[in-house]
Amino acid sequence: MIIERLVGNLRDLNPLDFSVDHVDLEWFETRKKIARFKTRQGKDIAIRLKDAPKLGLSQGDILFKEEKEIIAVNILDSEVIHIQAKSVAEVAKICYEIGNRHAALYYGESQFEFKTPFEKPTLALLEKLGVQNRVLSSKLDSKERLTVSMPHSEPNFKVSLASDFKVVVK
């Protein structure tokens, strides 16, 4: 089965009305536009998304829906660093340091809380900066992702220089 478009999200439906099969993905697999996976029930699916979400697949995204059968995305829990900032200045420092490492950064549960995938050097940096943190198991859902850039990706727009030296995006 080849999936080319997302059909919706489970949060917009009553899952009890359907037979739901899941594709379990690690957080870093949610940004793939082309991939092959097996569902929990053993169905082979190929994903070739034409209009992939910029942030990637999210928890509950529906890949396939036919009558009462649904195949949806389940993002597996992974080891993450939960970061709790104390001030706006500390938020800026956290965003700068995590971004400087090109690491993924996600919104947390509260206003000054963030999550990033666990890496020992990042944990050591946060400790050195005196930033409150703890290592927990949690989902890193693309809809909560702060960073949008995708390494090694091609832009889906064309930039050219106009005769009056203005940048034109098409």
UniProtKB/Swiss-Prot annotation:
- Protein's UniProt keywords contain Nucleotide-binding: no
Q: What does UniProt give as GO cellular component?
A: cytoplasm
Query: What does the UniProt function comment say about this protein?
Result: Involved in urease metallocenter assembly. Binds nickel. Probably functions as a nickel donor during metallocenter assembly.
The reply to whether Lipid biosynthesis figures as a keyword in the UniProt entry is no
- Indicate the principal place this protein occupies in or around the cell: cytoplasm
Subcellular localization(s) per the UniProt record:
Cytoplasm
List, alphabetically, the Pfam families matched. Answer: UreE_C, UreE_N
> A GO term (biological process) for this protein?
urea metabolic process
Q: What organism, scientifically named, is this protein from?
A: Helicobacter pylori (strain ATCC 700392 / 26695)
Q: Which GO terms describe its molecular function?
A: nickel cation binding; unfolded protein binding
Q: What is this protein called?
A: Urease accessory protein UreE
Which keywords does this chain's UniProt record carry? Chaperone, Cytoplasm, Nickel, Nickel insertion, Virulence
Alphabetical list of InterPro entries matching this protein: UreE, UreE_C_dom, UreE_N, UreE_N_sf
Q: Which family does the entry's similarity section mention?
A: Belongs to the UreE family.
According to the lineage, what is the superkingdom? Bacteria
